[in-house]
Amino acid sequence: MTIAIVIGTHGWAAEQLLKTAEMLLGEQENVGWIDFVPGENAETLIEKYNAQLAKLDTTKGVLFLVDTWGGSPFNAASRIVVDKEHYEVIAGVNIPMLVETLMARDDDPSFDELVALAVETGREGVKALKAKPVEKAAPAPAAAAPKAAPTPAKPMGPNDYMVIGLARIDDRLIHGQVATRWTKETNVSRIIVVSDEVAADTVRKTLLTQVAPPGVTAHVVDVAKMIRVYNNPKYAGERVMLLFTNPTDVERLVEGGVKITSVNVGGMAFRQGKTQVNNAVSVDEKDIEAFKKLNARGIELEVRKVSTDPKLKMMDLISKIDK
């Protein structure tokens, strides 16, 4: 049997990618695919991936071909492959990559050879018909900065804290919408995941720090450490994005003295015991209690998956439960 391939994308593109490849090559064996739709999260995707793997022969290894680096299909696949030999994830799947990889499987390459071929053909398959190479000017050498004289310690003022460009509740944490739209539009230099649970999970913590977009660093800390970091003048003026999995952690952070004026609710997946308030957000009694406490502090609670969505008021959605 050949090396197994699983395609994972946002929306329903994965199935169509496979159908396009099969139109060129004929029906393929030992290939699976999963879609990713609103309301799902990494846990849902892991279940979907495992359901596909159960149908495939994984003896020679598994190659996950996903659409975007740091997106939810990538993040879920990364958690599966992290401790398995001959399991790999490649981001940027396109038709040239998929077709060449499927054809190469029939020649019984080694797992590493197939991975290298997939990456190479995916890159080579992206070309412009008429564009000419653009030469980049060499950057001018930077002038040496003058040494600043040491300043005496002083009490922290209102401008001596980090700037919170966005505080967002999204149980998918760093994924496509965060890594692309929100990071650019909020102009942050750091993404900080604030969660006791995630900070204690070494594998998940490591993966999250690897999926930040270019020019942005990612960190995972527990609530207590985030309070200490916020009060450290070393980070004064630095724009950051805070990501949470639930409103309880936000309320704990605010209770600890971190100044948050607005919270964006981007996604809280449905699971048993929760009530769905729209297609992306589900809450239980603990969530509702935390939202009420935040609302009582005068903190804006708005629901949007991406910045171009109209703002919905979280408390209005909660008020409609059981009506």
Curated annotation (Swiss-Prot):
Changing residue 48 to C: Retains more than 50% of phosphotransferase activity. Its main location: cytoplasm. The active site is at residues 10, 175. Disulfide bonds: none annotated. Induction: Expression of the manXYZ operon is positively regulated by the cAMP-CRP complex and negatively regulated by the Mlc transcriptional repressor. Expression is also weakly repressed by NagC. GO terms for cellular component: cytoplasm; cytosol; membrane; plasma membrane; transmembrane transporter complex. The record marks 89 as: Involved in the phosphoryl transfer between H-10 and H-175. The phosphoenolpyruvate-dependent sugar phosphotransferase system (sugar PTS), a major carbohydrate active transport system, catalyzes the phosphorylation of incoming sugar substrates concomitantly with their translocation across the cell membrane. The enzyme II ManXYZ PTS system is involved in mannose transport. The PTS EIIA type-4 domain is phosphorylated by phospho-HPr on a histidyl residue. Then, it transfers the phosphoryl group to the PTS EIIB type-4 domain. Residues 2-124 form the PTS EIIA type-4 domain. Residues 157-320 form the PTS EIIB type-4 domain. The modification N6-acetyllysine is found at residues 55, 234. Homodimer. The modification Phosphohistidine is found at residues 10, 175. Keywords: Acetylation, Cell inner membrane, Cell membrane, Cytoplasm, Kinase, Membrane, Phosphoprotein, Phosphotransferase system, Sugar transport, Transferase, Transport. It is found in: Cytoplasm; Cell inner membrane. One of its GO terms (molecular function) is kinase activity. This is PTS system mannose-specific EIIAB component. GO terms for biological process: D-glucose import across plasma membrane; fructose import across plasma membrane; mannose transmembrane transport; N-acetylglucosamine transport; phosphoenolpyruvate-dependent sugar phosphotransferase system. It comes from Escherichia coli (strain K12). Coiled coil: none annotated. Its EC number is 2.7.1.191. It holds the Pfam family PTSIIB_sorb. It catalyses: D-mannose(out) + N(pros)-phospho-L-histidyl-[protein] = D-mannose 6-phosphate(in) + L-histidyl-[protein]. It is a peripheral membrane protein.
